[in-house]
Amino acid sequence: TGNAGPDLNGSQRAGDNLFTVSILALDTDTGEYRWHFQQVHHDIWDYDSPSPVVLFDVEKDGVMRKGLAEASKSGYLYILDRITGEPLIGIPEVPVPQEPGQATAATQPIPVGDSMVPHFIDAAPEGFTLVNDGKTYTPFGKEGALYKPLAGVNWPPKSYDPETGLLYVCANDRIGGAAQEREASPPTHTETWLG
């Protein structure tokens, strides 16, 4: 699913913003809700996942599992059991820095293992100061901040090779920067938010 709006200003939408930036499973026969997994709580970085998930079958602990993989703009790869929504690899909730003016979430689900892209900035670009080493989920206020990645995995779809068991992903290694809107008007039920 997409992110909540306004996407760079979380001050008006406290909480995790349930079902945004999520993988949502519905029963194909009835349309009934099955499960969901939220990839980013209270997204202020535009870290939704615009490309489709990849479905695959894999043996784990001697049992064949029906897997689902989603590579996100956050630069993380979420691997879930597509029947239950449970992670096939660990995805602990990790404490992250806070920005009270953005009502940021206290934790984010971060998959264990190697990342697809760097999640910190080695050195500040000229004229900029780094906050929190520019790490992923660095919150920003009205003064702004740099963070990495910017659109770690964007629109290009992923591909899985069942012969090799490899997932192929087109990823970006770019620095992002944002500042909270100074005067945000409350959204109305008739507005469309694009991000």
Question: Model-derived features: where do they sit?
Answer:
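Beta-sheet-rich non-transmembrane sensory/scaffold domains
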Residues: T1-G195
